[in-house]
Amino acid sequence: MDNLVSIITPCYNSEKYIDDCVNSVIAQSYNKWEMIIVDDCSSDASVEKIMLLSNIDSRIRIIKLEENHGAAEARNIALEDANGSFIAFLDADDFWEPIKLECQINYMTKKNIAFSFTSYTITSQSGDKTKNVVRAPKEISYNSYLKNTIIGCLTVVINRKITGSFQFPKIKSSHDMALWLEIMKRGYNAYGLQTSYANYRIVSTSNTSNKLH
């Protein structure tokens, strides 16, 4: 569907944070979206919380995995189920600013851009914003990304009508970086918005999270 954004969210034992994550999507000023949350066999109350949220907003749906597959495979399963031309990524313990999608989709459609990302803010485990903002450069090519892997997955939007279909590679780590390189290798540079539209939550190593998954 034209200009529909499919938001891909892997979830693993994120009961403490999933409400903030999903509510930040529901609060978006841009309303043409669907959110696909893949629960990767959580052992906490994540599924119950997601079910409650999906009952509030029909644009949210959950895919429950019976075995643990890891974040890359969870994202790939969601990609196969996604209906949108635009694909966005948001981990279950992160959250967006309300105008994130509106600003990013407008930017991409006006300039016919295939791959964009934004600056993002580091938050505490409780979600309090710090002064630490990871600033997005205006443009990143394949060669420059090899030297500076600055793209935050929680900020990325890709127009797959332009890039063609894609999946995350089945590797143990850095699968997002590998995918960005693949997209750039196809000839699509990544363009950055300097405003921070997303919030990256730092979780302690004692908590099980998709960031550590």
What does each model-found stretch correspond to?
Residues 24, 39-48, 67, 91:
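A conserved acidic beta->alpha catalytic loop
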Residues 99-130:
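Conserved donor NDP-sugar-binding/catalytic core segment of glycosyltransferases
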Residues 65-82, 103:
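Glycine-rich, basic loop-to-helix element that forms the pyrophosphate-binding segment
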Residues 87:
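Short aromatic/hydrophobic "clamp" motif used to bind/position activated sugar donors
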Residues 16-19, 44-52, 75, 95, ...:
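Acidic helix N-cap motif at the loop->helix transition within catalytic regions
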Residues 91-95, 119:
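The conserved acidic donor/metal-binding loop of glycosyltransferases
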Residues 1-27:
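N-proximal low-complexity "stem/linker" segments adjacent to membrane-targeting elements
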